[in-house]
A protein has these predicted regions:
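Glycine-rich and small/hydrophobic secondary-structure elements
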Residues: 323-335
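Short amphipathic alpha-helical segments
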Residues: 98-110, 284-288, 292, 332-339, ...
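Active-site lining segments that contact anionic ligands and/or coordinate catalytic metals
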Residues: 270, 342-349, 360-364
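Extended, charged amphipathic alpha-helical segments
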Residues: 192-324, 363-368
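Extended, helix-rich architectural segments
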Residues: 1-133
């Protein structure tokens, strides 16, 4: 399925490719990428305050801090069980111990990749040679390049950082094609090429990035997390002002009044002072929070079990004890088996180039948890 970050070229030639990748990066600031960035903020629970603060005035936020909850990673882990336990990897019918020794934290990174791919709808997984073994990076923002009429990308580009002048730096990889070697190069946001090796040749001949695509993202989970953060902040405000809003009548507008338990309030004749209560109840507000979470869970074949031990108006009533997966994840297995095979072939070639050792054919994987 094509996305806004897929580039289709009418034909393949080095000049067309180089011109396209320089122009393509200018379109990366798309709505799809903004939503993906928000999803990852909530998954890693970083910068989440900014996504809640925009819904409140500055004066309101001087009363209480925003109150986001760390529910997105729990949803992602409950919904994606394939890598809960390490899968069994085999080469030529035997345990792939040599391959395991040549990879660094593969199971950990694979589980993170599994969860973030489901959450965002699409992620890239880069294999790279590190300290005498293959190491891995997750790539959330990238461009894939296709020749018109072909379903497999011939290249990929993604940002890798900034230079000392704060220019964005990108990397481009392409596979060997029609007898020509693949390309590996860097370039900046102005399109200037930065050489990485002699002739900018891809030493592997393949793209060292593999991908998983879902038909949709879990955007409803992210929106539920935002709604819950807003609602919890509203609850904190309601608790802060549980005595009600102070209201005075019969007092000149310029009169300054200071409230406090250690202060005596002197009112002029005919003036009144009172607190007007909040018409809402904390219990009702907490049920709304639960409703947001429960609906997102149902949409994703999950069920939430809440702590019912405390009194309903207490914070204990909002403690999420467990998220149960109500549906077997067997349907996800073919997708992830395909990815395991694609990634293994990439790892195999990287290991062969750097060590002259072939890990072997007939790779197989068995997922212990579905």
């Amino acid at each position: 399925m094509m996305s806004v970050n897929d580039v289709v070229l009418p034909s393949y030639s080095e000049d067309i490719v180089l011109d396209s990748i320089r122009r393509a990066q200018k379109g990366l600031e798309e709505k799809e990428n903004a939503e993906r960035a928000t999803a990852l903020d909530f998954y890693y629970h970083k910068n989440v305050d900014t996504h809640i603060e925009q819904w409140f005035s500055t004066s309101t936020l001087q009363q209480v801090p925003v109150f986001p909850q760390k529910i997105v990673p729990r949803f992602a882990r409950a919904r994606n069980m394939i890598y809960k336990n390490s899968p069994k990897r085999m080469i030529n019918g035997e345990q792939a111990d040599d391959y395991k020794d040549m990879t660094h934290h593969l199971d950990t990174r694979a589980r993170e990749f599994n969860e973030t791919s489901w959450l965002t709808g699409q992620m890239g997984f880069r294999s790279r040679w590190g300290k005498e073994r293959v190491e891995y990076d997750l790539i959330p923002f990238f461009k894939k390049y296709y020749v018109q009429g072909e379903s497999e990308p011939f290249g990929v580009s993604y940002e890798v950082g900034r230079d000392h002048k704060n220019n964005r730096i990108y990397v481009f990889w392409s596979r060997a094609r029609d007898g020509a070697p693949g390309i590996h190069m860097k370039f900046d946001q102005a399109g200037r090429t930065i050489q990485v090796n002699d002739d900018n040749v891809n030493p592997y001949g393949i793209i060292p990035v593999t991908f998983v695509d879902y038909t949709t993202s879990a955007s409803d989970v992210i929106r539920a997390a935002i709604q819950i953060g807003i609602a919890n902040t509203e609850i904190a405000l309601a608790e802060r002002f549980s005595f009600g809003q102070p209201v005075a009548t019969g007092i000149e507008e310029a009169t300054k009044m200071k409230l406090g338990i250690d202060r005596v309030l002197l009112l002029p004749e005919g003036a009144t002072f009172s607190f007007v209560g909040n018409p809402g109840s904390l219990k009702d507000m907490m049920e709304v929070v639960k409703g947001f979470a429960n609906q997102a869970a149902v949409n994703n074949h999950l069920r939430i079990r809440w702590d019912e031990s405390g009194n309903p108006p207490s914070g204990t009533a909002l403690r999420l004890l467990e998220i149960e997966n109500l549906e077997s994840r067997i349907s996800d297995i073919p997708k992830w088996k395909d990815w395991e095979h694609e990634r293994y072939e990439v790892d195999r070639e990287i290991i062969r180039v750097h060590t002259n050792k072939d890990m072997g054919e007939n790779y197989a994987v068995d997922f212990a948890e579905v």
